[in-house]
């Protein structure tokens, strides 16, 4: 399939629609309420932080 400007815009909107971001944030908050307060310098949490950062950047990058 070819990528037109319209489909590209639609893709970006789907990627970071406020409703979806809110849902993801709620789920993440519920699951990692305890984890969040601790600093991410520890090896165990480093991977988690990276994953979160990547997800947040998703629209700006593309």
Curated annotation (Swiss-Prot):
Compartment(s):
Nucleus; Chromosome
How is the protein modified post-translationally, according to the record? Proteolytic processing into mature chains is required for histone eviction during spermatogenesis. Transition proteins (TNP1 and TNP2) are required for processing.
Name a biological process GO annotation.
Answer: cell differentiation
UniProt GO molecular function: DNA binding
Q: Which UniProt keywords apply?
A: Chromosome, Developmental protein, Differentiation, DNA condensation, DNA-binding, Nucleosome core, Nucleus, Spermatogenesis
Q: What is its main location?
A: nucleus
Q: In which tissues is it expressed?
A: Testis.
According to its record, what are the GO cellular component terms? nucleosome; nucleus
- The stretch of residues making up the signal peptide is none
Q: Which domain of life is it from?
A: Eukaryota
Which cysteines does the record link by disulfide bonds? none
Q: Which family does it belong to?
A: Belongs to the protamine P2 family.
Record function comment: Protamines substitute for histones in the chromatin of sperm during the haploid phase of spermatogenesis. They compact sperm DNA into a highly condensed, stable and inactive complex.
Return the protein name. Sperm histone P2a
Native organism is Equus caballus
């Amino acid at each position: 399939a070819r990528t037109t400007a319209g489909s590209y815009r639609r893709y970006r909107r789907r990627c970071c629609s406020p409703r979806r971001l809110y849902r993801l944030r709620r789920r993440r908050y519920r699951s990692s309420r305890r984890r969040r307060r601790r600093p991410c310098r520890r090896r165990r949490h480093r991977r988690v932080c990276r994953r979160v950062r990547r997800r947040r950047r998703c629209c700006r990058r593309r």
